[in-house]
Design a protein with these regions (language model features):
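Non-catalytic cap/lid and distal C-terminal segments of serine-dependent acyl enzymes
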Residues: 27-301
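Bacterial N-terminal signal peptides
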Residues: 10-20
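Positively charged n-region of N-terminal signal peptides that target proteins for export
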Residues: 1-6
């Protein structure tokens, strides 16, 4: 790819449920299918997109590893399509720089992929109990932990780490770009408006007003202090000039995992908190997951 553009506001708000979006006809390297799944837990329909690899339609009996790729705050299930990320993935497939696997992007609003503070929006329960089983039944996903990964960007990075650290028995690998990790919560007071602005980006999933105790209970860094993560492959990176200071949180997670002698891959790269940074490092995250799949799956490519 010569250019990855940042999504326009109107594109961020697009959400076509039940439609099928095809890759450009001139490039038969895969396609994206955007559909929806009814949820009893959330009492609504949830839209999602699946990037199907080049061989999916031709090889009718073949099954594939699956990567759940979670979007950031303010985005939606079509973020890879309207940002140019789908073209990036297709380039990797076309140039044989990435093996084939399913990439699934569910819509999550501002949920942070957790069960909300008020208990009314149980997104984590939905994801594990309804979404994963539904998607893996509809599409030809290889069964079992060894063929399943989860990753995300910003809020999605938080969600991926949160879910994988709480349920490591379900995933072979987890990855995150610029995950919404906060090293130390600021003093919450009306006078501390500058620090409070960092909390507003978290939305109301953690309570309104913000509940520090609930945050700590769900914080991936807190969970990682005691979680049994043996066998889970871990990758995360962050820009050294992250606009929200999430680089400090990423460094704290790196320090914690190192102190526990938990193998992981962490990178602090030059850059901020934007699509340009994510696009530059997305290939490395995808390749990380494919290498994990390749080491465990019968036929990963």
């Amino acid at each position: 790819m010569n250019k990855i553009w940042r999504p326009a506001l109107t594109a961020l708000l697009m959400g076509y449920m039940g439609c099928i979006l095809w890759a450009p006809a001139a490039r038969a390297t895969g396609r994206a299918e955007c559909v929806s799944l009814p949820s009893k837990i959330l009492v609504r329909t949830v839209s999602y997109c699946v990037l199907l690899p080049p061989s999916y339609d031709a090889e009718k009996t073949r099954r594939y590893p699956i990567l759940y790729l979670l979007h950031g705050l303010g985005d939606n299930d079509q973020f890879l399509i309207h940002s140019g990320g789908m073209n990036l993935v297709e380039d990797l497939w076309e140039q044989h720089e990435l093996g084939e696997f399913l990439i699934v992007t569910p819509a999550a609003g501002a949920s942070f992929y957790i069960n909300s503070h008020d208990g009314k929006r149980r997104y984590e329960d939905f994801f594990l109990q309804e979404f994963m089983p539904g998607v893996e039944k509809r599409y030809r996903a290889q069964a079992g932990r060894d063929s399943r990964g989860i990753a995300g960007i910003s809020m999605g990075g938080y969600g991926a780490l949160h879910i994988a650290f709480r349920h490591p028995q379900l995933f072979a690998a987890v990855g995150a770009h610029s995950a919404a990790l906060i090293e130390k919560l600021p003093n919450i007071s009306a006078q501390n408006s500058r620090q409070m602005s960092r909390l507003r980006v978290l939305g109301d999933a953690f309570g309104s007003p913000f509940d520090p105790t609930f945050w700590n209970q769900n914080d991936p860094v807190t969970i990682a202090r005691t979680a049994k993560l043996a066998g889970l492959k871990i990758y995360f990176d962050c820009g050294s000039e992250d606009d929200y200071g999430f680089d400090a949180g990423a460094a704290a997670l790196d320090k914690l995992l190192t102190s526990r002698h938990i193998p992981h891959e962490f990178h602090l790269y030059p850059g901020g908190h934007n699509w340009g940074y994510f696009a530059e490092h997305l290939p490395a995250l995808l390749e990380f997951h494919f290498h994990v799949f390749a080491s465990t799956s019968v036929r990963p490519n």
